[in-house]
Amino acid sequence: MAFNLRNRNFLKLLDFTPKEIHFLLDLSAELKRAKYAGTEQKTLQGKNIALIFEKSSTRTRCAFEVAAFDQGAQVSYIGPSGSQIGHKESMKDTARVLGRMYDGIQYRGFGQEIVEVLGQYAGVPVWNGLTDEFHPTQILADLLTMQEYGRSKQLHEMKFAYLGDARNNMGNSLMVGAAKMGMDIRLVAPKAYWPNDALVATCQEIAKQTGAKITLTEEVQEGVKGCDFLYTDVWVSMGEAADAWDERVALMKPYQVNMDVIKATGNPQVKFMHCLPAFHDDQTKVGQEIAAKYGMQGLEVTEEVFESEYSIVFDEAENRLHTIKAVMVATLGQ
């Protein structure tokens, strides 16, 4: 390997250099090609991996499980009600127990400090499947998808806008990813929903070294102009109270990604991205409640955009598999 990431944790992109991130993206593309060609080599044969989920998941769980199986590893799923973590046993103690039984551990849950403790004490590679602050495996998938749809542009030549709740783990992580890779990112959101000042300052310092451009704005037209990609996420995140909806919907409605926003980019080849799940129709229980209460068909994105030729959300979702596999292979593979 050009870079030795063996035995490294993957907790947040701030811990990795641009060259290391590029290496993981290149490895992801290589593993994706091998899977399609049927030539994949099993580099995790005989490895045992624990998947800790204190928050439920579809894409992250499936991606980790299939990636592990493809590479020859065995997994143990530890769900929200399947352990004593935080109830009868601290994460520090849990880490030291699981680290003696498993070769690698994935954690999806709440505070970033929890996965940091796990990474400090486990003694084996720990991978962040999502915390309240960061979602680094998603960003790798996003960057790989942007490379695939970049029309010969390099990442540092791309412009993209994130609309909506920019203080959540996706806003934070996309800003970090853009800063690391020298990209032009616009965080388009109400000022109260911008990332915290300390993280913005950290990313601005990184941007000085990489040539990235970070813009925070409340103006949709200004923010999306000339973009190659538009990105959004749900307006109310996992674990937030139900009574947050009314205020949030009223505040975020101007930041919905609809066809007017697509056209405002001035780029007929612009692509739409979303980490999923998305509230874009009334085919779910939540979607029906939204339609009944707010008279809206879709929240953060309209059905028209979600199902349009601009949308690449399912290619993006598939890339969770390939990038997660790359992280496991790079840090644990033989």
UniProtKB/Swiss-Prot annotation:
Coiled coil: none annotated. One of its GO terms (cellular component) is cytoplasm. Signal peptide: none annotated. It catalyses: carbamoyl phosphate + L-ornithine = L-citrulline + phosphate + H(+). Its main location: cytoplasm. Pathway: Amino-acid biosynthesis; L-arginine biosynthesis; L-arginine from L-ornithine and carbamoyl phosphate: step 1/3. Belongs to the aspartate/ornithine carbamoyltransferase superfamily. OTCase family. This is Ornithine carbamoyltransferase. It comes from Vibrio cholerae serotype O1 (strain ATCC 39315 / El Tor Inaba N16961).
